[in-house]
């Protein structure tokens, strides 16, 4: 019984502690609709506002509290996002009209050194600080671009300078590979050459004249190389046969002439000179000696060219630069090896018996006249009266 009494007394105390219920709302006036209360809709809570990072000397800024219910209005927007004269509608279920949000005034420490009414100035200063912080990167990019553009211009100027630099006409290298010489009359891009390149070209070609301007190089032999430094040259099969023929002919000629002289003047060969068989041998040996002499003369030029090539390889040479005054003097004396031009009328080619190689008085131009004669024979099938107009033909003849 005591427990039941205690429960009843506690219930009575709780009923007394509860506030009284509010009175029902008065009925609406006639002619208006009755508002039926509805249960509030569920709205998720808003995320927590970001905390503003404040310096050590700045006071903390009061942040707006979180919204606790659907009937509570939204917190005001920061001044940087919403001007002071903009109106927004509170997101609630109270069906209220548009409401002007109160302006939040930030302290001077948060906005900078300006007045409280200048929040945008602080943002501008902050942007300026960010801009000044980004300046080194921009400057580095610009400097890298300028350096790259400067490097490109330097590279182009270097290519142009290298293009205008004199180069060797054999190896196409510049003066860094050696001293460049001007050994002949050639001009332009084929004017210069290296000493070693030209000597190697002369040794391979076997000629002391330029293949372009036909100028004979002025070279001086310094000394012969040591025997251990001698180099072999490349020769063809025909040149090998010519060399063997000249060597064998020379050996036979030396042996034959030596025996003939001993038989003719030695007192120990008196009986040989009186014998008829030895007299026949003398005639045969004399004929063979003449054949050997002709063979040596005929093939000696080729062997001499091979010897000159070998000598050019195994000698220390010094090529001299082209001297125009010396060239003019040689040309005036007729010692120049340049090509000559013959101007002949075109009607001379129509006459078959006008020019003949046997009528030449100077053997230096025989090659050119032979070419003219062959060209005349090739035109034999053409009609002579077909073209009676006057004209000229230019034939370039090189002295051999």
UniProtKB/Swiss-Prot annotation:
GO BP terms: protein ubiquitination
Motif position, PDZ-binding: 397-400
Binding residues for Zn(2+) 2: 184, 186, 210, 213
Topology of this chain in the membrane: Multi-pass membrane protein
Keyword annotations from UniProtKB, A to Z: Cytoplasmic vesicle, Membrane, Metal-binding, Transferase, Transmembrane, Transmembrane helix, Ubl conjugation pathway, Zinc, Zinc-finger
Motif YXXL motif: positions: 369-372
Region called Disordered, residue ranges: 1-160
Biased composition (Basic and acidic residues): 1-14, 96-106, 123-132
Assembly, per entry: Interacts (YXXL motif) with AP1M1. Interacts (via PDZ-binding motif) with LIN7A. Interacts with unidentified fucose glycoproteins.
Name of the featured protein: E3 ubiquitin-protein ligase MARCHF11
Gene source species: Mus musculus
């Amino acid at each position: 019984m005591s427990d039941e009494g205690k429960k009843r007394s506690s219930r009575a105390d709780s009923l007394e502690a509860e506030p009284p219920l509010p009175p029902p709302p008065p009925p609406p006036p006639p002619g208006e609709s009755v508002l039926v209360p509805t249960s509030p809709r569920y709205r998720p809570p808003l995320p927590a506002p970001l905390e503003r990072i404040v310096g050590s000397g700045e006071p903390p800024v009061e942040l707006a509290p979180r919204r606790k219910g659907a009937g509570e209005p939204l917190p005001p927007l920061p001044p940087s996002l919403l001007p002071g004269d903009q109106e927004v509608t509170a997101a609630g279920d109270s069906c209220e009209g548009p409401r002007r949000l109160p302006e939040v005034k930030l302290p001077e420490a948060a906005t900078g050194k300006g007045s409280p009414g200048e929040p945008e100035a602080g943002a501008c200063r902050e942007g300026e600080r960010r801009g000044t912080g980004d300046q080194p990167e921009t400057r580095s990019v610009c400097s890298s671009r300028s350096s790259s553009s400067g490097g490109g211009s330097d590279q182009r100027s270097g290519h142009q300078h290298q293009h205008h630099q004199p180069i060797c006409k054999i190896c196409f290298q510049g003066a860094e590979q050696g001293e460049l010489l001007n050994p002949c009359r050639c001009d332009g891009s084929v004017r210069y050459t290296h000493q070693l390149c030209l000597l190697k070209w002369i040794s391979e070609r076997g000629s002391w004249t330029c293949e372009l301007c036909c100028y004979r190089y002025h070279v001086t032999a310094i000394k012969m190389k040591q025997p251990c430094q001698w180099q072999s040259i490349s020769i063809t099969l025909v040149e090998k046969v010519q060399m063997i023929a000249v060597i064998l002919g020379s050996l036979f000629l030396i042996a034959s002439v030596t025996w003939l002289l001993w038989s003719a003047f030695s007192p120990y060969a008196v009986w040989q000179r009186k014998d008829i068989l030895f007299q026949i041998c003398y005639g045969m040996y004399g004929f063979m000696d003449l054949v050997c002499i002709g063979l040596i003369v005929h093939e000696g030029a080729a062997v001499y060219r091979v010897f000159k090539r070998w000598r050019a390889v195994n000698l220390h040479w010094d090529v001299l630069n082209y001297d125009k005054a010396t060239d003019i003097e040689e040309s005036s004396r007729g010692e120049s090896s340049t090509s000559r031009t013959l101007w002949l009328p075109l009607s001379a080619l129509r006459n078959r018996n006008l020019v003949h190689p046997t009528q030449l008085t100077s053997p230096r131009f025989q090659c050119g006249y032979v070419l003219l004669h062959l060209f005349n024979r090739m035109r034999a099938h053409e009609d002579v009266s077909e073209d009676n107009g006057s004209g000229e033909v230019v034939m370039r003849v090189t002295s051999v």
